[in-house]
Swiss-Prot record:
Similarity field: Belongs to the UPF0246 family.
BP GO terms, sorted: response to hydroperoxide
Taxonomic classification: Bacteria, Pseudomonadati, Pseudomonadota, Gammaproteobacteria, Enterobacterales
InterPro entries: YaaA
Pfam name, any one: H2O2_YaaD
Protein name, UniProt field: UPF0246 protein YaaA
Signal peptide bounds: none
GO cellular component, one term: cytosol
Organism of provenance: Salmonella agona (strain SL483)
Domain of life of the source: Bacteria
Length: 257
């Protein structure tokens, strides 16, 4: 079983590390090509392209400039411990033990605009380059054209290595669009998280993101390997709703608190 999640805009390079183990990202040659493109942008261009403030644009122009292909624990941090958005609040990787990191390294992948695919312990230098950004590059007009089949091929390698054909898609639409489902050698399962609001169940972005992290942690902690095991997920009040679920879309609901 391979779990896919999105990266986060918020990064943490300060907190104590939960592990000193690390690996190197596998697609750095491609990342370097994107960095070369990004370095051609001025801070005002970055601001317009990403829709961010001048201050953030300056920070990211500096990050692109400072980025170097030789990753060490001094200039980089394990991806699963560097990302700090809502998904990662649910995941709480900072509390993983060695066995959790082992399982996650084999079964969890983070999709990334700059790095393509990251394993949890892959070192990562700080960046901001969302998958949906229209950064022109030698391969096309955006990052989807840049990555092409590369991300899908890397996921197929991971599936082959673990010997099964199940992908649990906990990534956002923006990021999963970088994967080619028809070329993926796997059964695709998408958990959906609905929260009750004024008597109706709907996707509430903040809660849904955190729930994706909670589900990822549930799979990792319990060493789940079969799709049917996912329906036992019951963290923070969620329950499986068989009536509205299908074989490839598992619906989890939570009543208003």
């Amino acid at each position: 079983m391979l779990i896919l999640i999105s990266p986060a805009k918020t990064l943490d390079y300060q907190s104590p590390l939960a592990t000193t183990r690390y690996t190197q990202p596998e697609l750095l040659d491609h990342s370097q090509q994107l960095i070369q493109q990004a370095r051609q942008l001025s801070a005002p261009q970055i601001s317009r392209l990403m829709g961010i403030s001048d201050k953030l644009a300056d920070l990211n122009a500096t990050r692109f400039h400072d980025w170097q292909p030789h990753f060490t624990p001094d200039n980089a941090r394990q991806a699963i411990l560097a990302f700090k958005g809502d998904v990662y609040t649910g995941l709480q990787a900072e509390t993983f033990n060695d066995a959790d990191f082992d399982f996650a390294q084999q079964h969890l992948r983070m999709l990334s605009g700059l790095y393509g695919v990251l394993r949890p312990l892959d070192l990562m230098q700080p960046y901001r380059l969302e998958m949906g950004i229209r950064l022109e590059n030698p391969r096309g007009k955006d990052l989807y054209q840049f990555w092409g089949d590369i991300i899908t091929d890397k996921l197929n390698e991971a599936l082959e290595a673990q010997g099964d054909r199940v992908v649990v898609n906990l990534a956002s639409e923006e990021y999963f669009k970088s994967v080619k489902p028809k070329k993926l050698n796997a059964e695709l399962i998408k958990p959906v998280f609905l929260d009750e609001k004024n008597g109706k169940f709907k996707v509430v972005s903040f809660y849904a993101k955190k729930a994706r992290g909670l589900m990822s942690r549930f799979i990792i902690e319990n060493r789940l390997t079969k799709p049917e095991q996912l329906i036992a997920f019951d963290r923070e009040g969620y329950f499986f709703d068989e009536e509205t679920s299908t074989q490839d879309e598992l619906v989890f609901k939570r009543y208003e608190q």
